Amino acid sequence: METQRASFSLGRSSLWLLLLGLVVPSASAQDLSYREAVLRAVDQFNERSSEANLYRLLELDPPPEQDVEHPGARKPVSFTVKETVCPRTTPQPPEQCDFKENGLVKQCVGTVTRYWIRGDFDITCNNIQSAGLFRRLRDSIRRGQQKILEKARRIGERIKDIFRG
């Protein structure tokens, strides 16, 4: 009788452990911070990229406010990466690579899960024009603006001359 009770108790305990195992996510997945999840996404970007060099996190936009925290829920992310001097084939982690002077900068957006399972992300990265191009564009606009203002001044002087008579 005692053996039956012990066996029944052991069976019930096993059932509870089994149910608990189904409810709690497996140990192969990890609960990551927002930053860690983004760093993993950058690693995956580098693995899937056909670019010659590795990219490294340049700037991490703040995480959006979430009402309810569900570890498995997809979280929107936004960050910027920059090309490094390390070739993509290097075993060195991107965090140990220096940024390439005038390297490409990419703005990345997408979703990741904080409860990380390998490859569970959806990120798109697009080139951002380098600061040099923006500077040249700004300077061209200023020069064009100055030319327009100079022509408007000349037209104004001609109109004054017409009314003077």
From Swiss-Prot:
Coiled coil: none annotated. GO terms for biological process: antimicrobial humoral immune response mediated by antimicrobial peptide; defense response to Gram-negative bacterium; defense response to Gram-positive bacterium; innate immune response. The gene is CATHL7. The modification Arginine amide is found at R164. Expressed in bone marrow myeloid cells, spleen and testis. GO terms for cellular component: extracellular space. The keyword Signal applies. This is Cathelicidin-7. Exerts a potent antimicrobial activity. PROSITE patterns: CATHELICIDINS_1, CATHELICIDINS_2. Belongs to the cathelicidin family. It comes from Bos taurus. InterPro entries: Cathelicidin-like, Cathelicidin_CS, Cathlecidin_C, Cystatin_sf. The keyword Signal applies. Disulfide bonds join C86-C97, C108-C125.
